Amino acid sequence: MVLKEPPAERIQQLRRLLQRASYAYYALDQPIMEDEVYDQLYRELQELEAAYPEYITPDSPTQRIGEAPVSQFESVSHRIPLYSLENAFTFADMVAWQERWQRYWRTLRQEEPLPPAEYVCELKMDGVALALTYENGLLVRGATRGDGQRGEDVTSNVRTIRPIPLRLALDNPPPVVEVRGEAFLPLERFHQLNQERQAQGEPPFANPRNAAAGTLRQLDPRIVAQRQLDFFAYALHLPEGGSVPLGENQAGEPQSQRQVLYALQHLGFRVNPHHADCPDLEAVKAYYDRWQTARHQLPYLTDGIVVKLNDLKLQQTLGFTQKFPRGSIAWKYEPEQAITDVLAITVQVGRTGALTPVAELAPVQLAGTTVSRATLHNADYIAELDLHIGDKVVIHKAGEIIPEIVRVFPELRPPTARPFTMPTACPECHQPVVRPANEAVSRCGNPRCPAIVRGQIRHWASRDALDIQGLGEKLVQQLVTKELVRTPADLYRLTAAQLLSLERMGQKSADKLLVAIANSKQQPWPRVLYGLGIRHVGSVNAQLLADRFKSVEELATATVADLCGVDGIGEEIAQAVQEWFQDPDHQSLIADLQALGLQLAAALHPAQKALTTEKSLNGKRFVITGTLPTLTREQAKALIQKHGGHVSESVSRQTDYLVVGEKAGSKLRRAQELGIPCINETELIQMCR
């Protein structure tokens, strides 16, 4: 590449061009550059930075995706609490809210006249709240809401979201800028993702919000980048003061929500364009009524509107309740309802053996999706509804997510309708069903029931447990049906040959899954405990127990009294834990997991595991060539070193193995000439076990 100017200058010029183009495209929605031109300049910048790495900076457009996957997210404190909003559901709720803040204001400022009730209304995005921190104009942190005081540090994932600027579009930014906004998945991309997942045998996402939340908790930023999240900013704080654009020829600290939105856009953020100034609650109602209907024309989901007092000083004076800011509120849309027919009632068997009846419905459109099923919980729920197969019913989405039946029309019941009775034999394994005393749920008592095993494996692989990416529902079905997997421990004995015998499983997918399974061994003790699937032990209780009992041996030998001594653990949970560990099958599973190297003690957190793992590659010398299917070169190098091996840059007679990926070069020819064994990624991973 021949340069007309010094490389440092050209690199800076390219960055400015690309950042200006991104600002125009995302913040202003006014593209100034063709995609082909952008791509060409981006590639030139990549090449220059590769040639002159000393000029790479964190805010370069090329550095959005560059961090290696993490083992877990750190908890971080919000400098300014990120509160959720109080919900209103009717206009009467809105009137009551206005009366409350006005009444509270009078208790604070009895001598002063009541300030005007001027509002700014914005669409409430159905996504995931993020808190972004910029220092001297550079993005230094992105965190989830969490409990409002503390969230998870997802900076590496946030950097991949293109509408979020890595550097603020301001020459002299304030020392610290805090931005709040919503990450979401546009509907078109949501449907594309689900098509891709179903083609790969993975379960589809239930809705765009779940997809966005799951994406932000991915440990690998490359996956986040592929999913193409979007972002709208809505709040701005300057904790150390400073000046931002507030209008034409105007700058300073924002005094109104209107100025906040203006400033955000001129700092480089996308702001939802459908906001409005509303001088009173009647105008707010008109805005709400409009979007209650018009929301279905938008390319993303919105589940209500957010109403904020425009005056920021007034908001600040009103402060917060224990849970919510007093100066803003979310007015949720009315849940959509639809009438349909119950075609059948089927029964699902869960991982604990619980039998759950499900209404199979004539498909109907509801809240932007096609609904064909609704949960019926248990036999008592069906009896309370007086529901028959063949009935005409009203369904709605609880929280606009979970479809449920809210009304039955017995007066429209056809002569062919028939009542439903819970089966006395499990629909999966045909063993007897029992209904324990004082429980509304019937259960299959066969621990080897295929449905129970499938549920246990799915739970083990779930996000909050061992988080095994790629182990979808259809794949679990095949593994259990072919009896390749009977317990979670069997996952760690799977071979590439076994996986390749399954439908729709190629070498690349098999390699990727084996890596994900191997990586899950590094998950800490609380996640493993949750993954065991003990009744009543969710992720929160698993953390409580793991904090008190530092190993599986301590927990397995704890008495009910010991367990009840943990704050938050009652007798019912304690009994369930004790009974689980007394089961011989479960004792065998624990022994298996220990032998396989799972983290069943706090002392064997990933940071310590490297010190205790048997060094299976001790003294061996490796060279890596080409692109590996799932591991980056740095990850492969770290894996080899972790197990006692050494990595060299060039092949010599001292090389023990060459790890070969796609587009291998001269190193492969040299290794073949010297007779050095060549292995692929899967074989490397198996050597590390």
UniProtKB/Swiss-Prot annotation:
One of its GO terms (molecular function) is DNA binding. Zn(2+) binds at C426, C429, C444, C449. The keyword Membrane does not apply. It catalyses: NAD(+) + (deoxyribonucleotide)n-3'-hydroxyl + 5'-phospho-(deoxyribonucleotide)m = (deoxyribonucleotide)n+m + AMP + beta-nicotinamide D-nucleotide. NAD(+) binds at D35, E36, V37, Y38, D39, S84, L85, E122, R145, E182, K308, K332. It is an enzyme of class 6 (ligase). It holds the Pfam family DNA_ligase_OB. Keywords: DNA damage, DNA repair, DNA replication, Ligase, Magnesium, Manganese, Metal-binding, NAD, Zinc. Residues 612-689 form the BRCT domain. DNA ligase that catalyzes the formation of phosphodiester linkages between 5'-phosphoryl and 3'-hydroxyl groups in double-stranded DNA using NAD as a coenzyme and as the energy source for the reaction. It is essential for DNA replication and repair of damaged DNA. Belongs to the NAD-dependent DNA ligase family. LigA subfamily. This is DNA ligase. It comes from Thermosynechococcus vestitus (strain NIES-2133 / IAM M-273 / BP-1). The lineage of its organism: Bacteria, Bacillati, Cyanobacteriota, Cyanophyceae, Acaryochloridales.
